[in-house]
C-alpha cells in the first residue's frame, strides 16, 4: 500500500481533532462506528475512509450539517489524484503541498525559485544534476513546473527572498521574468544582497506553506541531497517563520529589488 498523501493525512488529523473534541477515545469511537480499533487508527493516520464512513464520523462527533462542507471538501480532494501524476515525476510530496497552499514564503540560497524560473533556466538546472536524466524526464519536469506557475495567476500569495548568490547563472531573460512576476499584486520578490553579511540564510533554502483547512496550519518544507522533509511541529515552524521575517528585513525592499535585478539585466 502506498504512503498516504498530504491531503489524506490532513483529513485524518481533522477527524481525530473532531473525535477528541467530542470527548471520545479512539476505542469508544471505533465501537460506536462498528469499526475495529485498528481501522480507525489507520484512518486517523491518513488512510482514506469511505464517503459514508466519513459522514458517519461527522455525525458521531457532533458536526452540524451546516458545518460539514469543509470536511466533505477535504474528503473529495483527498480522493483525487493530482494532475501531476501522469508525468511520473519525483516531487517528494511538495507539489501536493503547493497545490493546496494559499500562501508560500520561499527563501532560496542557490537557485531562482521554481515558480519564478523560465523554461531555459529549468532545463539548465535539471541538466546540471549529478544524476543524468533522459530528455523525456527533463521535459516532463519542465512541463510540470510551468503548470505549477499557473498558481501565481490564480492568486496564490507568494513571497520570495532570493540570495544574491543565486543570480550569477541567471541570464537576461530570467532576470526580466522575475521582475515581470513581481509586478503581480500577489507576488513579492526581495533580493538578499551579499552586503547583508553572515545571516541565518546561509543554513539553506526553505519554504513555509500556509493552508486554509479547518484548523489553519503552516508546513515547513526543506529539500536536501537525499530527498526532502516537511515539518509541522509548531515550535520549529514558528522559529523558521521568525528566520524568514529576519531575512526579509535584511533584504532589499521589493521596489529596490526590482531595480537591482533590472540593473543586472541591463549588464547581460
Say what each PLM segment does.
Residues 103, 107-268:
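Hydrophobic protein-protein interaction segments
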Residues 54, 92-97, 263-264:
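Short alpha-helical linear motifs
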Residues 8-11, 25-30, 83-85, 94, ...:
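Short hydrophobic/aromatic-rich motifs at helix boundaries and adjacent loops
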Residues 44, 98, 223:
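Acidic-residue sensor for enzyme active/binding pockets
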Residues 1-81:
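Basic, Lys/Arg-rich alpha-helical nucleic-acid-recognition elements, primarily the DNA-binding modules
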Residues 31-33, 91, 259-260:
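Short secondary-structure junction/hinge motifs that connect adjacent elements
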Residues 50-51, 62, 87-90, 209, ...:
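Short, structured secondary-structure boundary patches
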Residues 69-103:
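Short, charged recognition helix plus adjacent turn
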Amino acid at each position: 500500500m502506498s504512503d498516504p498523501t498530504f491531503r489524506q493525512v490532513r483529513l485524518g488529523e481533522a477527524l481525530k481533532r473532531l473525535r477528541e473534541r467530542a470527548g471520545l477515545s479512539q476505542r469508544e469511537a471505533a465501537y460506536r462506528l462498528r469499526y475495529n480499533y485498528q481501522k480507525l487508527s489507520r484512518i486517523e493516520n491518513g488512510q482514506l475512509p469511505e464517503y459514508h464512513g466519513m459522514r458517519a464520523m461527522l455525525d458521531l462527533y457532533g458536526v452540524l450539517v451546516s458545518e460539514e462542507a469543509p470536511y466533505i471538501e477535504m474528503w473529495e480532494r483527498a480522493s483525487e489524484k493530482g494532475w501531476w501524476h501522469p508525468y511520473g515525476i519525483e516531487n517528494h510530496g511538495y507539489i501536493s503541498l503547493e497545490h493546496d497552499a494559499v500562501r508560500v514564503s520561499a527563501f532560496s540560497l542557490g537557485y531562482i525559485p521554481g515558480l519564478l524560473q523560465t523554461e531555459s533556466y529549468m532545463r539548465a538546472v535539471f541538466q546540471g544534476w549529478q544524476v543524468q536524466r533522459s530528455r523525456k524526464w527533463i521535459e516532463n519536469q519542465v512541463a510540470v513546473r510551468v503548470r505549477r506557475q499557473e498558481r501565481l495567476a490564480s492568486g496564490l500569495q507568494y513571497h520570495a527572498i532570493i540570495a544574491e548568490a543565486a543570480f550569477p547563472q541567471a541570464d537576461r531573460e530570467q532576470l526580466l521574468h522575475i521582475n515581470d512576476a513581481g509586478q503581480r499584486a500577489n507576488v513579492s520578490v526581495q533580493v538578499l544582497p551579499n552586503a547583508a553579511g553572515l545571516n541565518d540564510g546561509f543554513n539553506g533554502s526553505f519554504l513555509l506553506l500556509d493552508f486554509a483547512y479547518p484548523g489553519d496550519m503552516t508546513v515547513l518544507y526543506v529539500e536536501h541531497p537525499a530527498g526532502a522533509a516537511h515539518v509541522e511541529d509548531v515550535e520549529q515552524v514558528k522559529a523558521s517563520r521568525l528566520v524568514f521575517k529576519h531575512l526579509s528585513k535584511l533584504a532589499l525592499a521589493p521596489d529596490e529589488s526590482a531595480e537591482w535585478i533590472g540593473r543586472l539585466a541591463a549588464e547581460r
